C-alpha cells in the first residue's frame, strides 16, 4: 500500500517542503508517501473561478492512482481524532488499496472530484493555508503509523 497527497496550488515554500520531506522520510518504512502538486487553474479579473476549479479537477483525476481509496479534504467533511485516523489506516492496510488524499484549490474540489471521494475529511473548523494542510496531513499520517507500530512518537 502506498499513499499519495495530491495538492492543488503553487509550489510550496521551502519551510513547507522541508517539513513535508521530514515526515515523508519518517513515514517511508511504514507507508510510502508521495506528494503530487497540481497546477492551479487560472484565476483573476474576467476569469470564471468555476472553470479554474473544473480544470484543476481534471488534473487531479489524472493524478489519482488506479483503484485508490480517495479521501478529499473539505471543510464540511468529517473530523477525525489521531486515534481514529490510526484505526482507519489499519483498516486500509487490510484492504491493500493505495490511498489518495486530496487538497483542493481556493474554491475547493470540482464536483467530479467530490463525486469520486470515498470519504471527505475536515482538518477542523479553523481556516488554514492549504500549504500548512500538507504538513498537517503528513504529520498525522506519520502519527497514525507510529501509533500502529507502538512507536513512542504519540504519547496521548
Swiss-Prot record:
One of its GO terms (molecular function) is rRNA (pseudouridine-N3-)-methyltransferase activity. S-adenosyl-L-methionine binds at residues 73, 104, 123-128. The keyword Ligase does not apply. Keywords: Cytoplasm, Methyltransferase, rRNA processing, S-adenosyl-L-methionine, Transferase. CDD domains: RlmH-like (cd18081). SUPFAM superfamilies: alpha/beta knot. Its main location: cytoplasm. It is found in: Cytoplasm. It is an enzyme of class 2 (transferase). InterPro entries: Alpha/beta_knot_MTases, RlmH-like, tRNA_m1G_MTases_N. Pfam families: SPOUT_MTase. It comes from the Bacteria. GO terms for cellular component: cytoplasm. HAMAP family: 23SrRNA_methyltr_H (MF_00658). Belongs to the RNA methyltransferase RlmH family. Homodimer. Specifically methylates the pseudouridine at position 1915 (m3Psi1915) in 23S rRNA. This is Ribosomal RNA large subunit methyltransferase H.
